[in-house]
Amino acid sequence: MRVGSAVSPKVLKGFRDLLPDEEIERALLVEKLTVALRQMGFVPIDTPALEYTEVLLRKSEGDTEKQMFRFVDKGGRDVALRFDLTVPLARFVATHYARLYFPFKRYHFAKVWRGEKPQMGRYREFTQCDFDIVGSDSVCADFEILKSIRHMLYMAGAEHIRIHVAHRGLFDRFLRALSLSDQAEHILRIIDKRAKMAPHVLTAQLESLCDPVRVQKIMTYVSAGEVDGVAPSFEHTLSAIETLTGGVSEESTRLRKIYELLCAVNIQSSYVFDPSITRGFDYYTGMVCETFLTQLPHIGSVCSGGRYDHLTALYMKDAVSGVGASIGLDRLYAAFQQLGMSREHVCFVQALIFCQDSALMDVYQKLCSYFAVQVATEVFPDPRKLSQQYAFAEKKGIRWGIFVEQRNAVVEDCLLVLRDLSTRKDTRLPAHEVRRRMAAEG
């Protein structure tokens, strides 16, 4: 390429590169979440990033279709990048139904793509962690998902959380009583964006769908039980909703049973019943939830989900019910950064063998293998100036520097200089003592 004709190395809006420190932190977060998921019996799966558009849109239209990255491939097929991991799960279950065992508890860490407006902690390409229980319509499965959310976030270090729970069926019942079933999908989407709207904007949007009297009833429903904007107990709010919806129902009874299980394991203080939680996707049919960090409520939900009883029926004859949730890894990580929970620097390598003479590379590599049994070690690949090698070690956060002072046919007897790079203090020791000391001090 001619000088001056280089392409600008810019990144698309809503997309980003991740430098090593950030990617390491994210990987450590994924490890913590993975451990928690495995402790609760979930197993991993993977699905293609690219699917047939008709598969992804079978039950999601409107805003979802507008936000999809969609194109016609070279074979003339209408395809799109997945916008979530729930719809691909339904397709996955239908495809592999005969080979799966039920209830099937899966987790899936993967990137998804949505063409929405980027904001803090929200990108057009982002990573989700989904976990679901497919093949059980029991209250216990709903409870397990809610319990899992708390356990995972606690394992990740987020102890100050509040999980808001509701039931789509209750809201549907309420809208039917108002003769608004035909407008349910639009109303649900408006309510789902309630936190981002000024009250007068919310009211105006609802009034475009129904009269002011019914708008007021909807507002009473979504704020049921609030006192000066503060949500009271789960039971108090549920009783208020039962009054608004004509008494005890199958949906309210199910929520009450979920709450009883939360109380049975003494974690109920992390949960509130919030009738305004509707979730924007139209495949949800039962319990729905959103999770907020109490120290950063403005950042939005870091984990959301719910029950979907008919989703697999779109791809197979018999419907398989499911319930699950999704953690937005990027938003959660951004929140941890704001809270000062992420470390400034993480380094997996503890020692660097400085290269003083390329003729000694065989000795360096033997020592590296010898140390690596107990201490993560690497060799600088060429004999550059020591100042450059020091700068490399400092940027990478490596603690120990190793210099070969006297080689020996027996690698563990080589005489070395062990330098603590944070203090520049030197100690002359044979290799076996160097390994012992580094392993002991970490």
UniProtKB/Swiss-Prot annotation:
It is found in: Cytoplasm. Its main location: cytoplasm. GO terms for cellular component: cytoplasm. GO terms for molecular function: ATP binding; histidine-tRNA ligase activity. The keyword Transit peptide does not apply. It comes from the Bacteria. Its EC number is 6.1.1.21. GO terms for biological process: histidyl-tRNA aminoacylation. Belongs to the class-II aminoacyl-tRNA synthetase family. This is Histidine--tRNA ligase.
